[in-house]
Amino acid sequence: MEIIFGRNKKEQLEPLRATVTGSIPAWLQGTLLRNGPGMHTVGDSKYNHWFDGLALLHSFSIRDGEVFYRSKYLQSDTYNANIEANRIVVSEFGTMAYPDPCKNIFSKAFSYLSHTIPDFTDNCLINIMKCGEDFYATTETNYIRKIDPQTLETLEKVDYRKYVAVNLATSHPHYDEAGNVLNMGTSIADKGGTKYVMFKIPATAPGSKKKGKNPLKHSEVFCSIPSRSLLSPSYYHSFGVTENYVVFLEQPFKLDILKMATAYMRGVSWASCMTFCKEDKTYIHIIDQKTRKPVPTKFYTDPMVVFHHVNAYEEDGCVLFDVIAYEDNSLYQLFYLANLNKDFEEKSRLTSVPTLRRFAVPLHVDKDAEVGSNLVKVSSTTATALKEKDDHVYCQPEVLYEGLELPRINYAHNGKPYRYIFAAEVQWSPVPTKILKYDVLTKSSLKWSEESCWPAEPLFVPTPGAKDEDDGVILSAIISTDPQKLPFLLILDAKSFTELARASVDVDMHLDLHGLFIPDAGWNAVKQTPAKTQEDENSDHPTGLTAPGLGHGENDFTAGHGGKSL
């Protein structure tokens, strides 16, 4: 696996024309912008975990049937400090950078003290977020980095803490029809409490539609949920939204804050301070978007680890939400670089297969309902919600599919009933070998695969004016374990899952994580969404935080990114 994981990737600073085979639809005009780890060693020092690698941005610009590729390392403070020192000097989640051995005892003592409450990295390697007219590389810390989506130049550094009190934040925000951003973060021991903070960033600065105004300055707290534990908050990678509610899972995959505070002096990584508590429950929080308060009923399910929400919607008095769930945290453990050897593809095995699970949460619980009765009256799912003696509700999911990750949908259906999921098929190994189209209605699937090929997260781009949910194309950056085979951008017909075209490039491409598609200038997001009602037209601040036309609870500025992801 040296070709994929063990070798630093080279930048392609100038646009490189790809060799296109097949026919690219004439309407497909824009830039696929992706993010992921590309550098795993600096000098003689090595990162411990694949998710620690320095961020490498890359893009495929599609114009009139031609494709141009470029890539560039994110010029973060972390990157610059490491390169200048020729070693890793900034800690990542799985790699603790140690003090200079030449420092005297007083300098070392000060370093230990300064790391008690760590200033996290700005190595934003996970996703791309659109905020107003700007694009940002994101990670799961309080920092994001503004970038130029065309040149891939790194611009200013933004600290969420200047606007909202969060130490950590997700890389999978949601968007409403106006382009407002909804995201979540964790505020650690703020004013004596640890809480999960939902915050909203307006699409434009209030009172001005002029370009250049920073909407981040006008961020507001949408809702706060106290952590069940002051010193052991839940780790979460994403969340879900419907037209009227927000879905947040407080799962028993936890951060031990005391251990994190002493990690530096103990010489261990922050990742070692994460614990999966298999005896604990997963608590389901449903937040009303209108009142901005959680539904008072206590919902829970069995212990699980969820990285990616797929979608959520309301039906017959219930919130239905779909997630990719694991029985444990083995996925994260497998990607330590020590495990990514030549036998990784054959020998790496998850101890729990990622499953697509559908939960149904009743919005109104009959106090007179019998204990043990199923409160779900939705005919479209076998998921149950059982009333218990203490008025808690135990939710059991319907398992829809086994062996998939990195889910995307047509974001025009985010927060609404939907039918299709586009994902990478992974089964018991974390290696993505196929692209999957899954129909949640018929439970049928279509797949694309090719020998020695590893596909990245598949991104759906709808045909302009499309009426069918799957009328569009799938874009996926494909790398190969065969050094003789060039990497390429794959373009599939989303309906039939047949190949329309591929654009091969003779570059050292990395396996990326998440990203978005930016249509060419002139595209109007509002025109690509269903017509607004009169009530919507009269509201300057719509409460429905769904985003037809945008990304996967993430960010796909296609004419039409699926539900959110990693």
Swiss-Prot record:
Pathway: Cofactor metabolism; retinol metabolism. Its main location: cytoplasm. The keyword Iron applies. InterPro entries: Carotenoid_Oase. Keywords: Cytoplasm, Dioxygenase, Iron, Lipid metabolism, Metal-binding, Oxidoreductase. It catalyses: all-trans-beta-carotene + O2 = 2 all-trans-retinal. It is found in: Cytoplasm, Cytosol. This is Beta,beta-carotene 15,15'-dioxygenase. It comes from Rattus norvegicus. The lineage of its organism: Eukaryota, Metazoa, Chordata, Craniata, Vertebrata. The gene is Bco1.
